[in-house]
Amino acid sequence: MESQWRGAAATAFHQHWLARLLLWVSTLSCSFSLPASLPPSLVPRVRSSYTMGKTFLGLDKCNACIGTSICKKFFKEEIRFDNSLASHLGLPPQDLHSYAANYSDDSKTWRPVEISQLVSRYQIEISDRRICASVSAPKTCSIERILQKTGRFQKWLQAKRLTPDLVQGLPSPFLRCPSQRLLDRVVRRYAEVVDAGSIFMDHFTAGDKLRLLYTLAVNAHPIILQIFPGAEGWPMPRYLGSCGRFLVSTSTRPLQEFYDASPEQAADLAYQLLRVLESLRSNDLNYFFYFTHVDAGMFGIFDNGHLFIRDASALGIIDKQEGSQAAARTGENEDIFSCLVSDCQIQLSSCDTVPEKQSLVLVCQQLLPQLLQGKFPSPVQKEIDSALSLCSKDNSTDLEVLGATSWLKDILRSLRTCDPRFAYRYPDCKYNDRF
C-alpha cells in the first residue's frame, strides 16, 4: 500500500515538473509547440497548464504587451504569488489590479515584490475590443497584427530615433510635453531590449518597438521607473522586469494604510512627501515633474519607513533645460493608440500653463489632512492646520503655496524623532544636528 502511494506521488510530481519545464522553455514564445517525447496522457494537462499561465500573464497578446524580460522568473517559480493563492500554477484571481508576491534570485532567499497590471482587467478587455473594432474585426482578432498595420507603427518601424512626432496624440501625461532629451532617455534606458545604452533604435526589433509603443500608449508607469531609477536617488521603486501585461517592482505599502499612524510617524511621512515633491519640482537634471491628480495609492512606504512614488501613471514631465514640444491632440495625430484606455476627446493644455504649485496643492487638499489632522497638541495642530489651509487653495499663487509648504515642512521637521522605527535614516540621524 505504501509503495503504491509513493508511486502515485512520484508520478504526480513528475507530471507537475514536466508541465513546469515546458512552461519555462516556452515562455518567450507566443506560439505553442509540444515535445514529441511527452507522453500522450500528459498532453491535455500540460497544454491546459501552459494556456492558463500564458493567458493570465497576457503572453498570448504579445507583442501588444509590456515585455518579456522577467518571464523566466515566473516559470522557474522564482516569483511566487503570496500565500499560493491558487492551485497548480499558483495563479491568483484575475480581478485584482496588483498582487503581493515573493521574488528570489537563488530559490533560497526571498523578498517581497509587487506584481501589477497597467490598467484593470476590465480596461484591458475594452482596449482589446477597441483594437478589433477599429478594423471591424471579430472580438477575438489578432490585436498584434492589427497594431502592426497602423500608420503610426509603420512610422516607428522606419524610425532610427524616437522623436516627438512619433508620440504625438498619445494620452499619457508623461508625453504631454515631450522633449528630444526625454525621449532619448527612454530609448537609452529601456530595459526590455538586450543592448540598452544608445539613443538610436537600431538594435530594436519590430516586437521591441511595438512593446514600447503599447506601453507608452496604455500607461507610462514602467517606463518612468526604468528611466528615473531609485538607485540614482529618484523616489521610485525598483523596476525588476515585465512579463506579458504584468510588471514586477519592489514592494511598498500604500499610504492610506498609515492614516492612523502615530503622530511621530505621520509627521515623518508628511515631511517625506513634501521632500519628494520638492525633488520632483527642482532637480539636477532640470526636469519638472507634476501630478495631474493624486490619491493615497500613488505613494507607498518600504519596510524601512522610506516613502516612494508607488504609481507614476499620473506624472507629467516638462524639460526645463531643453524646452518641451506641446503634445497636440488634433485629428491628424489621433489613432487607435490614442484611445486604448482613455477618451479620445481628452484635451491637453499648453505646457506653459502647468503651475509650479500644482502637485503641492493636490497633496495639501487630498493627502496631508488625512495624515495630520487631529494628531498633535493644540498649539502645533493649529499651526499645521493653518499651513494646510494656505497650501490647499486653488487660487493661491505659486509663491504663496511654496511659502506655506516650506512653513509646514519646518513644523514637521521639528516633530520627527530619531529611533529605530525609521530605519531608512537611523542611526544616521543620531549624528545629525537637526535631530
UniProtKB/Swiss-Prot annotation:
<comment type="similarity">
    <text>Belongs to the DIPK family.</text>
</comment>
<feature type="glycosylation site" description="N-linked (GlcNAc...) asparagine">
    <location>
        <position position="102"/>
    </location>
</feature>
<dbReference type="InterPro" id="IPR020519">
    <property type="entry name" value="DIPK2A/B"/>
</dbReference>
<dbReference type="Pfam" id="PF12260">
    <property type="entry name" value="PIP49_C"/>
</dbReference>
<feature type="glycosylation site" description="N-linked (GlcNAc...) asparagine">
    <location>
        <position position="395"/>
    </location>
</feature>
<keyword id="KW-0325">Glycoprotein</keyword>
<dbReference type="InterPro" id="IPR022049">
    <property type="entry name" value="FAM69_kinase_dom"/>
</dbReference>
<keyword id="KW-0964">Secreted</keyword>
<dbReference type="GO" id="GO:0005576">
    <property type="term" value="C:extracellular region"/>
</dbReference>
<keyword id="KW-0732">Signal</keyword>
<protein>
    <recommendedName>
        <fullName>Divergent protein kinase domain 2B</fullName>
    </recommendedName>
</protein>
<feature type="signal peptide">
    <location>
        <begin position="1"/>
        <end position="33"/>
    </location>
</feature>
